[in-house]
Curated annotation (Swiss-Prot):
It is found in: Secreted. Residues 28-267 form the Peptidase S1 domain. This is Serine protease 48. Pfam families: Trypsin. The gene is PRSS48. Glycans are attached at N263.
Amino acid sequence: MGPAGCAFTLLLLLGISVCGQPVYSSRVVGGQDAAAGRWPWQVSLHFDHNFICGGSLVSERLILTAAHCIQPTWTTFSYTVWLGSITVGDSRKRVKYYVSKIVIHPKYQDTTADVALLKLSSQVTFTSAILPICLPSVTKQLAIPPFCWVTGWGKVKESSDRDYHSALQEAEVPIIDRQACEQLYNPIGIFLPALEPVIKEDKICAGDTQNMKDSCKGDSGGPLSCHIDGVWIQTGVVSWGLECGKSLPGVYTNVIYYQKWINATISRANNLDFSDFLFPIVLLSLALLRPSCAFGPNTIHRVGTVAEAVACIQGWEENAWRFSPRGR
């Protein structure tokens, strides 16, 4: 174990916060494969083991993601979160956790309040490859730097036939002023001041259209990570946009805007609730039931394979992505 690994172990033993402090800090130019251990809070969200979205580890038991990645009618225990691996489908290094509870922001609608928290079935064990990212403080004014990083397994080109990239991608993107972003997305707004703005206070814009650096379909729910005062802080959640990396920047849910709700949800999640007792019972029941059993009128039926479930999920994601506000 090297000096960095020893220091990391000491921090854990002393109970000192390790959020936003990856052990490895090697860099790869934006838009290419990310180095192992550089983004230890990055997680992949799966439905019946099929990749659907990204997310970030924000505590020992909570994942932050986009609300549009989740459908409330789907069975919670069919969701899993994979941590510790930068390659989708690599079962050798990833650690899998089931989702026991889903909390979607109560005001979520279309692109508004596009944020959700997932409670894992058990606490995560932190390692050099699995660490949480820090969240903004509600009591301290946060100065967002001019450049931050977006990570995910989404398309590297909008025209790509693949729905996601197997290797985790990273890109350094400039933060775009909200008013400037509003003018890009809503150019007639300056002539119609009564028109409702597109880029509201709960959104952040980021992207480099000249060098084609942007998030895209498949990156939904992933973090916008900013290096501030020596630690990595999540300031955004990949939400939507138009034409990946071309003429308009990507739009992210503003984590700072929803931080009070996030803190309150995390605080409640740390307490035992009904889901902690129900989840083991549900898993046991599933083990005893046949694969073709139905759980209700809104359930996606599984007959031997998960083809129908995947088609439903990918179809919803594709429609959201094509919708004027892009759901990745």
